Amino acid sequence: MKILMVCLGNICRSPLAEGILQHKAFEAGLSWSVESAGTNGYHTGECPHPLSQKVAKMNGLDISKQRSRKFVAEDFERFDKIYALADDVLDEIRRIARNKFNPEKVDLLMNELYPGKDLDVPDPWYGPEPGYHDVYRMIDSVCDKIISKYSANPNPHRTVGIGTKPSSK
């Protein structure tokens, strides 16, 4: 399964989401690929925000090797599921995707925990460190739900590519 986490700049929230979900998938023995992107290109090529890295490290994750990239319409062909971390990000994904947008494939991340509530993961960019811890806890909880939901498959090591049938590894 290929999952893309998307926030605004791809330096605070989505790098945490990528790191957390990739770690949880690995721990669960799932052969998932998790990546992240941002809807703007202001930080392309940059590593995650220092406070995102710090909070990840405090929780046993190293996200320092990640690099920001911009979300592109072709991501709809590359990923099985795309999670937006905020409503404005979801709107921008729709705009970028145009005719490739598939509502079955894209949702707000927090809808996994609170279906239909359309809650945002707040952007900690302007705040102090405690906001990054809050964001980490929110994302950690929803990633547990994602693992539980998608690993219920009787063959959890399957890989699914766009336009291909599930296959065993």
Task: Please identify what each model-predicted range represents.
Residues 81, 87-163, 168-169:
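Phosphate-binding/catalytic loops
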Residues 14, 86-87:
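Helix N-cap/beta->alpha junction signal
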Residues 1-78, 148-158, 166-169:
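Conserved active-site segments centered on acidic
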Residues 7, 56, 83-84, 139:
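Hydrophobic structural packing positions in well-ordered secondary structure
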